[in-house]
Amino acid sequence: MVLHRTLIAAAVLAATAPAWASTEEAARAVEEPAQADAAEPASDEGESVVVRDRAGESLTSFTHLTREDIARRPTEDGNITDLLKSNPAVQFSNHGDGSLQMGEIKPSNISIHGSVAYQNNYTLDGISTNSDLDPAEQTSVTTTRLGGSDEQGFYVDSRLIDSVTVYDHNIPASFGGFTGGVIDAQTRSWSGENHISVFGRMTKSGWSRIHTDSALDVGSGDADVSKPAQFQTDFEKKTYGFTGEWGITDNLGVVVGYTRRESKIPTIQVPGTRVSIVPDDQNWTGWGVLETPVAGGTQTQRRTADNFFAKATLYATPWTEASLALTYSGYESKGFLTTVADSGYEDHHDGLNLTASVKHRMKAGVLDSSLAYTRMTDKRTSDVKNWTQLDRYTIGMDDTGSTSTTSMTSAASGGLGDLESTQSVINAKTRMDCEPVMVGSVSHQFSAGADLSSTHAEYRRGSNYYRWGVTQSVMQSDYGEFSQTDFYTTRWKAGTYEADYNQAALFGEHRMGVGDFVIRTGLRAEYDDFTKDVNIAPRFTTSWDLFGNGGSVITVGANRYYGRNILTYALYKAQNGGMENIYDYASDDSPAADGWFAANDFDGLERLKTPFSQIRQEPSPL
């Protein structure tokens, strides 16, 4: 199997100043690039987002939100993705952000220019915080292989963010690991002040008015197994916490914050059937089926998210700044499968990040280096450790022996098993941005850097997990009734499986400007020892400021972006290497001596290649 994705698009990149930025501000963004980080709103009439390139020209398409922008924006749950709802390049998931899932508190899945959500790169202070442990499965809990993680490894409170930048095309070579875009969040540093803020908020369904189509049945008991909390017509959410910053000395200070989000979602558990396999001498297999009705009712699903952040910043000299940041993000979900008896489960996600960074300004330019350790854990525990599925076929026979009627009923009970997976990453990154150099009338500016990471992943199953399938065939005729029961068992063996892989990237860019014409050429070279690919990603962008005031700029670019290697594939062989099937009933208490056969579904992993997107952008006539 080869995972390649190629995208060729034509876009209008030449236009007047964006509708949300005045021409005067667009011009100032070009004339005063050194002040780009201190963006002010374009007017007092409403919230404004000013799109600026950090180098002072429109070579890169991105949206930049300052702390002031973030403070003004209403958010549903305080997540970073809540800040991006007005970005035209960002599309939100219908499932994660719909009106019928208002009890959820996790960040919504987003797509940038149509790419899958897990092929965006989420960075915190320049360090990638993506969870690569099967993020594509995070909307479904029915997988027996993994609990399902989320592409965002940290659910950071936006109150602790100093700025957010979304890069969607013509992205600099310093960024990699995406085919969609980059969401770059910079955390707050000590501003030289001392203050503390305490906050709290609450909302619930009784304070809202949800409009639904009367022709649709959207009760919580109508959700299917793959989306057990699909319809949340009743919910209650709370958020509370504090943020503060204090100076320890004249040039050393800290920022500390804690946020807790809670959600209660009363959901209907429909009446079900507990399916048990018991000894039965009347059956040729020696086993039979016992069905026990289980009453339904309303049960409360719960979600809890904790976020802690602490950052110490030392302004050692006017030219040197050092910081040490600790971020913790925890999430817990308690739920059940609506139509399955005894199916209660708990999902846990924990993320821990420790980042040390130093930024040094010198005559030649700015050197920015960081070293980080990140650990993310996903864990699932089930009330019942195994799963039983009963499918009963009733076949009516006429006098001639032909089938006259056929019907089928099904019942399932049990859980999805206990699982735990861990991703640990050590990352080192450095970048040098040189000061511009004039050669005659031509301005030259160089930047270069390196990005190294080492990843260790573990997958743990504490005990054997069994999935029992029972098929009953009941044939009815005028001569009587005959039935046959067959059993099928799938077993996932207990064990701990590990995988390691390393990645390295080198990147460099050259910016050349002549008057109002600018060309930026870049190259990013990447290697990882899982796919053993050497990926060369060229980046090229050129822009022409037609009138020299930033109001009308034509931009043309051709770029290649290589995506993420999902850790699931590195673990896949180990995970399913212990999966076996047998056409019989078997358990730890009643093991089958013979008849097991392997059920591998991981062929072709050695042929995997790194996914990539290739984008060409050309202007249309003005």
Model segments located where?
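Periplasmic N-terminal accessory/gating domains of Gram-negative outer-membrane beta-barrel systems
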Residues: E25-P41, A55-P172, T179-V182, Q186, ...
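Hydrophobic, lipid-facing positions within transmembrane beta-strands of outer-membrane proteins
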Residues: S108, G181, E236-F242, D306-A310, ...
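Outer-membrane beta-barrel channels and translocator barrels
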Residues: A117, S158, R188-W190, T249-N251, ...
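Short strand-turn segments of transmembrane beta-barrel domains in outer membranes
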Residues: D162-N170, V182-T187, G192-E245, G296-Q301
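Transmembrane beta-barrel wall of Gram-negative outer-membrane proteins
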Residues: N194-S197, A229-E332, H349-M362, P538
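Transmembrane beta-barrel strands of outer-membrane/channel proteins
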Residues: I196-K204, V256-R260, L324-G330, S369-R375, ...
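Solvent-exposed loop/turn elements at secondary-structure boundaries
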Residues: T409, T422-K429, Q445-S447, R467, ...
